[in-house]
Amino acid sequence: VPITEQDRLAGDDPAAPPEALAGGAHATGATQRSRAKETRRQALLSAAASLFAVNGFNRVSLEDLGAAAGVSGPAVYRHFPGKQAVLGALLLSVSQDLLDGGQSVVAAAGDPASALARLVQFHVDFALSNPDVIRVQDRDFSNLSADDQAQVRALQRSYVELWVDVLAGIHSETDTADLRMRAHATFGLINSTPHSVRNHGRRMAIKSARPLLENMALAALTAPA
């Protein structure tokens, strides 16, 4: 892959020593390099989501990742220490985004019913927008390092408990374990749909699936115990 000016800004030129990338730079140049590097990093994560979803983590090489993002395989090391670190960054990032987004949704709601409706809309939007990441999480979680597994689990537990707290405001007399089961069942319903829709080639369902998923999820979450 030819080295371009964007590669050099992103630090992807393997011939450039580290001091040449950092030393003597003006603030503007440093900012440009920082932005270019983050852009390249995000491109690698996007490529990883797609390639891991289609082929599985074990069948994707660093060269595959680099080529999909427009860099050489060795250049990937400028952004991640290895392929497992790419997987970790991908699943940690999406888990943190889910938690942060869910917390923002709940904070903006005026009451539990509104919070629940907004959470459902938020998660449906996430699932329809990120089917590849969901597939990678389901299939390749075991390929994470032990530390990344622990961090992803902690973030996702916090996300589940966010839903449980909102549900408790609606079902005040229902056992917490039951509320947690409702949340997990809802995630299963919502998360499984986008890939099944895409795998059957029915792109039309992306538009029609949104209200259907939202209504089904809310019906399950608000049904009497």
Please report, for each region that a protein language model flagged, where it lies by residue:
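C-terminal peripheral helix-coil segments that are non-catalytic and often amphipathic
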Residues: V1-T28, D125, V160-G169, E173, ...
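Hydrophobic/aromatic residues within well-ordered alpha-helical segments
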Residues: R40, K83, V94, L98, ...
